[in-house]
């Protein structure tokens, strides 16, 4: 009850800092009476971490990531549960200690708490550590393997993440497959940007008809976007439709005479 009330006070504290004092009093009371002190330390850490993530204009007393970490490590000293290690990774990640965060996520991934989210966290951290793309992709594969199969809408963003990594590493055909799987997962509820990204993958994979279909869709959904219209001209050029390409470029220049891309 104390922890729940402390959470309520912290939410109220955004407008009135005196509520933070009440939250601290509840923390202290919870630590006195709780049988599972590790659970209280963990909840204090989680609360302070969440508070810092919200980027407060002025930090209340010592409610920093370091304080969150100190409380969390007191919880871990009592019982090193994987859920505590996951939060340790998240706090270290927020502090930009990516090596420390990765070590924590790797422990979670070797535990019974391993999930799509924990493998994704490890993949993003490795990426920030400039690790080999093969290692990052292996973690993304593990992430997607832990999603429901076929992937559902809630887990679909992981497919977009992997597609982007494939594109950055010249694996356009694989990226296209992930974009297709994403499209299926969200029942075709996609926007112009999705069609533009998938078109880029199709173009790199030399699937020109597919690239053309997708860029047409992007232009349909956002007819004023000059990037899409210029790309439409480029794809027409690639498939040898020179007149169509020139027509599109002339239309762009008519609407926006200063648009430099159209002169390429």
Regions found by a protein language model. Give the residues of each.
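TPR-repeat structural position
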Residues: 20, 65, 98, 132-133, ...
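Register position in tetratricopeptide repeats
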Residues: 11, 50-51, 94, 128-129, ...
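TPR alpha-solenoid repeat register
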Residues: 1, 39-40, 84-85, 118, ...
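Canonical positions in the second alpha-helix
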Residues: 29-30, 74-75, 107-108, 143, ...
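Short coil turns that delineate tetratricopeptide repeat
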Residues: 35, 79-80, 113, 148, ...
């Amino acid at each position: 009850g104390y922890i729940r009330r402390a959470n309520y006070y912290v939410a109220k504290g955004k407008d009135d800092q005196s509520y933070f004092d009440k939250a601290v009093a509840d923390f202290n009371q919870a630590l006195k009476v709780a049988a599972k002190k590790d659970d209280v330390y963990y909840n204090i850490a989680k609360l302070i971490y969440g508070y810092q993530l919200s980027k407060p204009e002025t930090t209340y007393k010592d409610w920093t990531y370091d304080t969150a970490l100190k409380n969390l490590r007191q919880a871990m000293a009592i019982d090193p549960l994987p859920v505590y290690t996951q939060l340790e990774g998240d706090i270290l990640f927020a502090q930009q200690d990516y090596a420390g965060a990765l070590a924590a996520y790797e422990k979670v991934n070797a535990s019974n708490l391993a999930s799509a989210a924990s493998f994704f966290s490890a993949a993003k951290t490795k990426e920030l550590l400039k690790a080999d793309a093969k290692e990052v992709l292996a973690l993304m594969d593990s992430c997607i393997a832990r999603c429901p199969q076929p992937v559902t809408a809630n887990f679909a963003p992981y497919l977009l993440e992997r597609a982007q990594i494939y594109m950055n590493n010249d694996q356009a055909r694989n990226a296209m497959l992930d974009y297709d799987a994403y499209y299926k997962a969200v029942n075709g509820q996609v926007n112009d940007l999705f069609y533009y990204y998938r078109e880029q993958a199709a173009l790199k994979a030399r699937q020109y008809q597919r690239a053309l279909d997708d860029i047409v869709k992007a232009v349909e959904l956002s007819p004023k976007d000059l990037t899409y219209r210029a790309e439409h001209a480029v794809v027409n050029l690639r498939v040898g439709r020179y007149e169509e390409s020139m027509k599109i470029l002339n239309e762009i220049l008519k609407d926006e005479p200063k648009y430099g891309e159209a002169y390429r």
